[in-house]
């Protein structure tokens, strides 16, 4: 048997250790592999509303592409350095945009492209911006992402309450939007009962 150590603590098994049979038929299902990890102090602040991470995915009309956005309120003297989100399938192309002065959903049309590229494999990625973006003090800003995922018709990773394990998590703590073409937007929280998995990273004082 394999001897495993639970990374979530010592409550399960024998103080966190447990056995898995070589003949177990489920051990290879839903596997996650970390190939590269950044330092936890890469950036000064993180903006996020998806504390559970990806619980599921969604899309539009069996299309491989979609837009999604999250809105946050900047602190003092911050610059936006990077964003992170999921590729729900291999060979996902992406464009990242920023709206530095967000007042309502119509401002998402005034987005400025700050990064683009392709993610070869399905997974979770941190994308550094081409240049740091200064943010206005105490003002809302929006991060917008367009993805095209060739092998998936559910290109948006979302957080939502899907079973008893996630029933008590708050999905009303964000302001997210989704769109097929980036023109007509719907609220992730109010109309789709979910949060968008899209984080923003800033440095203070740069």
Go through each PLM region and give its residues:
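Residues within well-ordered beta-strands of beta-sheet-rich folds
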Residues: 5, 69-71, 81-86, 97, ...
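Aromatic- and Gly/Pro-enriched, solvent-exposed loop/edge beta-strand patches characteristic
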Residues: 90-171
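Active-site signature of cysteine proteases
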Residues: 1-77, 97, 155-205
């Amino acid at each position: 048997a394999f001897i495993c150590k639970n990374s979530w603590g010592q409550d399960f098994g024998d103080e966190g250790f447990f056995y898995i049979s070589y003949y177990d038929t489920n051990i290879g299902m839903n596997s996650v592999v970390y190939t590269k990890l950044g330092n936890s102090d890469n950036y000064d602040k993180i903006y996020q509303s998806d504390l559970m991470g990806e619980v599921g995915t969604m899309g539009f009309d069996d299309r491989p592409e979609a837009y999604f956005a999250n809105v946050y309120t900047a602190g003092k003297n911050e610059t936006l350095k990077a964003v992170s989100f999921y590729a729900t399938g291999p060979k996902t192309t992406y464009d990242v945009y920023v709206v530095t002065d967000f007042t309502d959903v119509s401002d998402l049309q005034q987005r400025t492209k700050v990064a683009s590229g392709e993610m070869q494999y399905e997974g979770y990625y941190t994308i550094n911006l081409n240049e740091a973006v200064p943010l206005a003090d105490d003002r809302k800003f929006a991060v917008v992402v367009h993805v095209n995922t060739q092998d998936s018709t559910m290109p948006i990773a979302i957080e939502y309450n899907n079973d008893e394990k996630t029933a008590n998590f708050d999905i009303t703590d964000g302001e997210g939007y989704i769109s097929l073409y980036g023109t007509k937007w719907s609220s992730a929280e109010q109309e789709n009962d979910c949060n968008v998995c899209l984080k923003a990273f800033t440095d203070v004082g740069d």
